[in-house]
């Protein structure tokens, strides 16, 4: 397999070493160098699949000098692969600055897709999957965490976060304070022998985990704002009613905005009115 010089963003397993594509193995074997977060972790995966390519550290501590060196390797015609400790690179992992610099310089960039823990957790959670938002790692401090939750409380999408298991109970107590007793899912040890996903309302999950000592990282999923979803239905019904009374679009928008301004902007209401008016 002959690869074009450039950067290859290669997904790796999140737990089960067999969750790697044939293309990923071939790409890593035919690279001149593999950038990784931790050589000790990546070496185990490479050994499993008989990959002997040289490893080089690229992590959160890497700076512009490291990026310049990597760019010089690609400029010289080398094939460079980027992997993370687990899953898809750049998803709450280092790398986007390197990709941005290479993109600005018009160097070749390719992705070799594969598993990702947020998507794996979402598909197992039984929470709605049609709309979701991944917000990365939750901060350590309560105030910072509260700020993030407050920004997302009205979203209709399923929310996905990374968190540390040791902070889970405190996170859930705060989540209940901000979101109410919503349905959530806690996913851990994904694709491993002791994989576990627990779905229920926040009180149920707190009760389940309050006496269990957890380690490592978890994926926390919080269902979207059902009240907002209900208001969307109510908005559409309200507009349909107004149209049935032959009210003008301007009047309907003003009435709807006064009633639903805590959820929708005038622009969003205009869009719904326009859609309903011309599909009625």
Curated annotation (Swiss-Prot):
Enzyme Commission number(s): 2.1.1.198
Principal subcellular localization: cytoplasm
Cytoplasm recorded as keyword: yes
InterPro entries: 4pyrrol_Mease (IPR000878), 4pyrrol_Methylase_sf (IPR035996), 4pyrrole_Mease_sub1 (IPR014777), 4pyrrole_Mease_sub2 (IPR014776), rRNA_ssu_MeTfrase_I (IPR008189), SAM_MeTrfase_RsmI_CS (IPR018063)
Reactions catalysed, as given in the entry: cytidine(1402) in 16S rRNA + S-adenosyl-L-methionine = 2'-O-methylcytidine(1402) in 16S rRNA + S-adenosyl-L-homocysteine + H(+)
Gene Ontology CC: cytoplasm
Name of the top EC class for this enzyme: transferase
Subcellular localization(s) per the UniProt record: Cytoplasm
Bridged cysteine pairs (disulfide): none
One term of GO molecular function: rRNA (cytosine-2'-O-)-methyltransferase activity
Keywords: Cytoplasm, Methyltransferase, rRNA processing, S-adenosyl-L-methionine, Transferase
Domain of life where this protein originates: Bacteria
HAMAP family reported for this sequence: 16SrRNA_methyltr_I (MF_01877)
Function recorded in the entry: Catalyzes the 2'-O-methylation of the ribose of cytidine 1402 (C1402) in 16S rRNA.
Family the entry assigns: Belongs to the methyltransferase superfamily. RsmI family.
Protein's name in the database: Ribosomal RNA small subunit methyltransferase I
């Amino acid at each position: 397999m002959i690869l074009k010089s450039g950067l290859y963003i290669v997904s790796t397993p999140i737990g089960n070493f067999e969750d790697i594509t044939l293309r990923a193995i071939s790409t890593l074997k035919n690279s001149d160098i593999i950038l990784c977060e931790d050589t000790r972790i990546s070496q185990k995966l490479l050994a499993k699949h008989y990959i002997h390519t040289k490893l080089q550290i690229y992590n959160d501590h890497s700076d512009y000098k490291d990026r310049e060196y990597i760019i010089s390797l690609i400029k010289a015609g080398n094939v460079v692969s980027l992997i993370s400790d687990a899953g898809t690179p750049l998803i709450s992992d280092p790398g986007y600055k390197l990709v941005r610099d290479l993109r600005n310089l018009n160097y070749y960039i390719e992705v070799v897709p594969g598993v990702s823990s947020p998507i794996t957790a979402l598909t197992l959670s039984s929470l709605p999957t049609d709309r979701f938002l991944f917000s990365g790692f939750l901060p350590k401090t309560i105030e910072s965490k509260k700020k993030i939750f407050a920004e997302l409380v009205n979203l209709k999408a399923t929310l996905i976060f990374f968190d540390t298991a040791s902070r889970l109970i405190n996170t859930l107590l705060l989540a209940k304070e901000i979101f109410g007793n919503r349905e959530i899912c806690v996913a851990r040890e994904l694709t491993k022998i002791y994989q576990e996903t627990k779905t229920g309302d926040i009180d149920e999950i707190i009760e389940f985990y309050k006496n269990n000592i957890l380690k490592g990282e978890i994926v926390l999923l919080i269902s979207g704002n059902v009240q907002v979803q209900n208001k969307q239905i109510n908005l559409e019904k309200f507009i349909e009613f107004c149209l049935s009374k032959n009210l003008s679009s301007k009047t309907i928008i003003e009435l709807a905005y006064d009633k639903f301004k805590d959820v929708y902007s005038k622009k969003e209401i205009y869009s719904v009115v326009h859609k309903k008016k011309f599909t009625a």
